[in-house]
């Protein structure tokens, strides 16, 4: 049976080192705590998928040697792989290559900034990679990047000459795929939570609106945000709500 690795790309959830663009409105301690909630929710989502699909969850983490920072955060069955490389592209490519060398038939690398990412989207990525033929599966992020990349071979050219953390990442990656004649499957768009605006959007969706169609309920994240709102009102983290 071919197993697909579902790898969460993650920094060790240390105060002052993660989610720094959420400070303010959050404090550095709150940002680290929210990062832990994101990891718990996304890992739980992946774990549930692995119970019914040919998939296995792990965290692709940085910095090397920080495994203890994830203690009590991830499911017991999750494995660890340290990120290697200077740029994001190098880290993604190296992780894909290493996991394929370990015997996985395919690899999906997923950012850890989208706690409500629907389970159905992840399953669609798995099913696409299980089909015959080579391809790249890309989850289109609303900011012009991608929240997921799935591959059956580590096509290093996909990651070359990309201006990472810009709105051109997805478009340039699709261009790279076309240059090497690699078919692309695009997944439905979703959003990253990486600044005050997207935090407010997440808070509004989890606490004040009906859930988006198919969105993962992110119970750890929801409880964290709800605690802040109940304690001091919504204006600090969700000022756009009427």
Q: What positions do the PLM features span?
A:
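Conserved donor-nucleotide/metal-binding helix-loop-beta segment in metal-dependent transferases, i.e.
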Residues: 117-143
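A short, N-terminal amphipathic alpha-helix
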Residues: 35-53
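N-terminal nucleotide-binding beta1-loop-alpha1 segment
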Residues: 1-21
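Short aromatic-hydrophobic micro-motifs that form the base-stacking/packing surface
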Residues: 108-110
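Conserved alpha/beta core of the MobA/IspD/sugar-nucleotide pyrophosphorylase nucleotidyltransferase superfamily
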Residues: 175-242
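Short, glycine-/small-residue-rich phosphate/pyrophosphate-handling segment
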Residues: 156-174
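Short phosphate-binding loop-to-helix
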Residues: 69-106
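Short beta-strand/loop segment that forms part of the nucleotide-sugar
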Residues: 54-63
């Amino acid at each position: 049976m071919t197993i697909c690795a579902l790898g969460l790309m993650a920094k060790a959830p240390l105060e002052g080192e993660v989610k720094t663009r959420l400070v303010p409105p959050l404090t550095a301690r709150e940002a680290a705590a929210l990062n832990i909630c994101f990891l718990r929710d996304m890992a739980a989502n992946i774990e549930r998928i692995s119970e019914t699909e040919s998939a296995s969850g792990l965290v692709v983490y940085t910095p090397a040697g920080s495994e203890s920072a994830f203690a009590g955060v991830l499911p017991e069955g999750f494995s660890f792989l340290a990120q290697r490389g200077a740029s994001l592209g190098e880290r993604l490519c190296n992780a894909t290559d290493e996991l394929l060398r370990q015997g996985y038939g395919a690899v999906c690398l997923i950012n850890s900034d989208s706690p409500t990412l629907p389970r159905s989207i992840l399953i669609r990525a798995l099913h696409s990679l299980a089909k015959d033929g080579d391809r790249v599966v890309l989850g289109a992020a609303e900011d012009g990047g991608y929240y997921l990349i799935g591959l059956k071979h580590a096509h290093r050219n996909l990651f070359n000459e990309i201006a990472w953390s810009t709105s051109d990442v997805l478009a340039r990656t699709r261009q790279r795929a076309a240059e090497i004649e690699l078919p692309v499957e695009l997944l439905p768009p979703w959003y990253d939570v990486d600044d005050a605006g997207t935090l407010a959007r997440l808070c509004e969706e989890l606490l004040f609106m009906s859930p988006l169609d198919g969105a993962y309920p992110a119970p750890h994240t929801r409880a964290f945000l709800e605690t802040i709102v109940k304690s001091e009102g919504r204006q600090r983290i969700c000022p756009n709500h009427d």
